[in-house]
Regions:
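Short conserved segment of the HATPase_c
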Residues: 52-65
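Short alpha-helical Gxxx[C/S/T] motif in the catalytic ATP-binding
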Residues: 78-82
Length: 120
């Protein structure tokens, strides 16, 4: 079993942001897959919704909304914050549309395994 040493609160906040978006836009299905290795933790979230629109490069910018009607309910900070958290943990946030419909977001965090834990 691998030892995860990334910041649990940060990972949970990113999971909350990404799952909230997936549930908001999904038609019927949201899939979550977690992969933990000695090098990284990867959280993949996929939905069967409409996918990202033409501005996929802007999705992780602050205050970005694909739907202007969301301005009243959402501040457009979730994907931005998630990207910043991933980057500050030596990782990245990958966003893509899925060929058969929907979107997939992968949050990757570097796994800081302590040397003494590796030697055990």
């Amino acid at each position: 079993s691998e030892i995860l040493t990334a910041d649990e609160e940060i990972i949970m906040e990113v999971a909350d942001n990404l799952l909230a978006n997936a549930f908001r836009y999904a038609n019927q299905e949201v899939r979550l897959k977690l992969t933990v290795t000695p090098q990284y933790l990867k959280m993949s979230i996929r939905d069967d919704g409409i996918g990202f629109q033409e501005n996929i490069d802007r999705v992780t910018q602050a205050f970005y909304h694909e739907n202007p009607q969301d301005d009243l309910k959402h501040f457009g900070m979730g994907m931005y914050i998630s990207r910043i958290y991933c980057e500050r943990h030596g990782g990245k946030l990958l966003i893509k549309n899925v060929a058969d419909g929907g979107a997939e977001v992968e949050a990757v965090f570097k796994n800081y395994v302590l040397e003494e834990q590796q030697q055990k």
